[in-house]
Swiss-Prot record:
Keywords: Signal. It comes from Oryza sativa subsp. japonica (Rice). Residues 1-19 form the signal peptide. This is BURP domain-containing protein 6. The lineage of its organism: Eukaryota, Viridiplantae, Streptophyta, Embryophyta, Tracheophyta. SMART domains: BURP. Residues 28-239 form the BURP domain. The keyword Acyltransferase does not apply. Expressed in leaves and shoot. Pfam families: BURP (PF03181).
Length: 239
């Protein structure tokens, strides 16, 4: 069972979230720099911050729409105007935004709905998930990691479904189809932490990736640009 799913069933407590720029998902690098012996500074985090996974029946009983936010906050006992309420507002807006051209997307509020979206998008129920695994409980420090091994994630058919943990009162995942290349990377931290981290490498010019190209000083779409996935993100692929 992937760690991301295991931790939804048995939520992991988390310290306060790091700044957006400090998280592993926002450290971009070129695919050519992903090789044994390379080093980079990373901070593995959880967007869901230990939020519990709701049974499908319970999740389906709670509204999930921006226009219903006051009702949602009341049902979930989240104070209006609080940082948590603001984060939920942002998540709902992101979930309601139109998908990018050629992309299918859905925000999954239960494990069952996530599996259904992955299966329908990949054209088969014979799917499995992979996620980043870190060998220590709780938050890890921002530190230097050394790449020990790099292995491609086998992807039958060339496409997969990525599901990203989102800030909400319970576990919510923003899922979308992608043709990014994926790798499992063995990392060793300066403090002895070991990680089997998922890296996704993109060649598209989506706004977020386009900004990464600018940071790295290369033309958009010219070479693959990569980032690691946080511990509560998942990639669904065909078996």
């Amino acid at each position: 069972m992937p760690g991301a799913i295991r931790d939804l069933i048995n939520p992991v407590s988390s310290a306060a979230s790091a700044s957006k720029e400090d998280t592993v998902n926002n450290v971009f690098f070129l695919e050519k720099d992903l090789f044994p012996g390379s080093k980079m500074t990373l901070h593995f985090t959880r967007a869901t911050a230990g939020a519990a996974l709701l049974p499908r029946g319970r999740a389906d009983s709670v509204p999930f729409a921006s226009e219903k936010l006051p009702e949602i906050l009341s049902q979930l006992s989240v104070p209006a105007g609080s940082p948590a309420a603001d984060a939920m507002r942002s998540t709902l807006a992101e979930c309601e935004a139109a998908p990018q051209a050629g992309e299918a997307k859905r925000c999954a509020t239960s494990l069952e709905s996530m599996v259904e979206f992955a299966a329908s998008s990949l054209g088969t129920r014979d799917v499995h998930a992979v996620s980043t695994e870190v060998d220590r409980a709780g938050p890890t420090p921002r530190q230097a990691y050394r790449v020990e091994a790099v292995r491609p994630v086998p992807v039958s058919g060339g496409d997969m479904v990525a599901c990203h943990g989102m800030a909400y009162a319970y576990a919510v995942f923003g899922c979308h189809t992608t043709t990014a290349a994926a790798y499992t990377v063995t990392l060793a931290g300066a403090d002895g932490t070991k990680a089997e981290a998922l890296a996704a490498c993109h060649t598209d010019a989506a706004p977020r990736v386009a900004e990464a190209y600018k940071r790295l000083g290369v033309a958009p779409g010219s070479v693959p640009v990569c980032h690691f996935l946080p511990q509560d993100d998942m990639l669904w692929v065909r078996n």
